């Protein structure tokens, strides 16, 4: 069998669903052709391969390219001052009601043109590349008007076309209310105009919403999701972050790819998510920055068999964190995830949360050849340490990226 590239003499953590745990293979090899994995497994069992290029990994660890399944990477302005305000005792809600929070970023983002949006996000993404991330989700939601939201999604698509990352674009029009419109008019714009136009233009892979008292209620989100499903788009949800508002159950009702945050999600809502196949995306960065006390019910997620992913939630206000490795470590320390759960949470389960479960997130024949090659003796070192990543090489679609 011919292949373009062959990585041999490696230790693999395949994260493949047909292998137990992290799917560890000692003395492993991976072969790719036309950007896809054609074989992965023990080198001793490798079929006869004729490789155009062979890379001796010298015993290094290879994992799937990491997947960050929840980010707000396109934005304007700076909200670092809100950190000091919260330290002084102001709440997230009070800052938002006084024109800070999402609306502050909205004003700054509306002032950017599409080129500036793309340039800012690409500069930030250098930190993700340095950590072996190959797939990233990018949301809109900081424009809250037609022109800016479309520009954000076009910028996200342009970043994906540039080839350094696989980008899943998500329309988050129902993030908060823009100040210049009333609720009925804005929801009508989102549901009747924006979602159909975005779907027709292929600008988004999914539609997200923020289901909280300070944003949108369950009935309003249901209308947004109905419009998304009618347009053929998947749905995701910011759910039960600040209070139990039935977000997890709502996500399950619409067969959402994921529900994210979930600090206040009920055990019943989590069980409904598991039955619906929705992934629970844990966002410990926001929990940390907001100094929350309520943790997601990880025990209920385990008991229900609900897959767990971990993401940065990178945004300029409540999770200004540019490290998926740190987020995974936080999920272990703050939320009690195991080492295995954390790794699956930033690989296979994160891909599932984007509807990309058959495409990336595991080293498995037929998937895209997205790899992270680590200069470590043990995978423990990748998540145990905070700071520069011990990354040797990052591969996207079979090519060094």
UniProtKB/Swiss-Prot annotation:
Binding site for Fe(3+): 70, 72, 238, 313
Catalysed transformations (reactions): 4-imidazolone-5-propanoate + H2O = N-formimidoyl-L-glutamate
Binding site for 4-imidazolone-5-propanoate: 79, 142, 175, 241, 318
Binding site for Zn(2+): 70, 72, 238, 313
Assigned keywords, A-Z: Cytoplasm, Histidine metabolism, Hydrolase, Iron, Metal-binding, Zinc
Residues bound to N-formimidoyl-L-glutamate: 142, 315, 317
Pathway as given in its UniProt record: Amino-acid degradation; L-histidine degradation into L-glutamate; N-formimidoyl-L-glutamate from L-histidine: step 3/3
Cofactor: Zn(2+); Fe(3+)
Subcellular localization, as worded in the UniProt entry: Cytoplasm
Gene Ontology molecular-function annotations: imidazolonepropionase activity; iron ion binding; zinc ion binding
A Pfam family assignment: Amidohydro_1
Function: Catalyzes the hydrolytic cleavage of the carbon-nitrogen bond in imidazolone-5-propanoate to yield N-formimidoyl-L-glutamate. It is the third step in the universal histidine degradation pathway.
NCBIfam families on file: hutI
Name assigned to this protein: Imidazolonepropionase
Species per Swiss-Prot/TrEMBL record: Acidiphilium cryptum (strain JF-5)
């Amino acid at each position: 069998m011919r292949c373009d590239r062959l990585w041999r003499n490696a230790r693999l953590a395949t994260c493949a669903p047909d292998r137990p745990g992290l799917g560890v293979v000692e003395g492993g090899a991976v072969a790719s052709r036309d950007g896809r994995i054609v074989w992965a497994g023990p080198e001793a069992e490798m079929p006869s391969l004729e490789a155009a290029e062979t890379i001796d990994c010298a015993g290094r660890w290879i994992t799937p390219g990491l997947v960050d399944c929840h980010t707000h990477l396109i934005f304007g302005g700076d909200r670092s001052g809100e950190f000091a305000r919260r330290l002084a005792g102001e709440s997230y809600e009070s800052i938002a009601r006084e024109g800070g929070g999402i609306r502050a970023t909205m004003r700054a983002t509306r002032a950017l043109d599409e080129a500036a949006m793309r340039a800012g996000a690409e500069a930030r993404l250098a930190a993700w590349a340095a950590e072996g991330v190959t797939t990233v989700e990018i949301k809109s939601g900081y424009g809250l008007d037609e022109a800016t939201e479309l520009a954000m999604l076009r910028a996200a698509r342009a970043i994906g076309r540039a080839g350094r990352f696989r980008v899943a674009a998500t329309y988050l029009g129902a993030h908060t209310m823009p100040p210049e419109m009333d609720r009925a008019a804005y929801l009508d714009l989102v549901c009747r105009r924006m979602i159909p136009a975005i779907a027709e233009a292929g600008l988004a892979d999914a539609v997200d919403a923020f289901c909280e008292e300070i944003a949108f209620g369950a009935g309003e989100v249901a209308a947004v999701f109905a419009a998304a499903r009618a347009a053929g788009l998947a749905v995701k949800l910011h759910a039960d972050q600040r209070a139990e508002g039935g977000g997890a159950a709502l996500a399950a009702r619409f067969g959402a790819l994921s529900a994210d945050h979930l600090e206040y999600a009920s055990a019943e809502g989590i069980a409904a998510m598991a039955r619906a196949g929705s992934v629970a995306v844990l966002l410990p960065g926001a929990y940390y920055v907001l100094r929350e006390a309520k943790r997601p019910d990880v025990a209920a997620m385990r008991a229900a068999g609900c897959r767990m992913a971990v993401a940065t939630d990178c945004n300029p206000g409540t999770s200004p964190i540019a490290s998926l490795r740190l987020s995974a470590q936080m999920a272990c320390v703050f939320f009690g995830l195991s080492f295995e759960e954390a790794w699956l949470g930033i690989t296979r389960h994160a891909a599932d949360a984007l509807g990309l479960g058959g495409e990336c997130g595991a080293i498995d024949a037929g998937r895209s050849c997205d790899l992270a090659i680590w200069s470590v003796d043990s995978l423990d070192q990748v998540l145990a340490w905070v700071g520069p990543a011990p990354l040797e090489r990052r591969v996207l679609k079979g090519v060094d990226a």
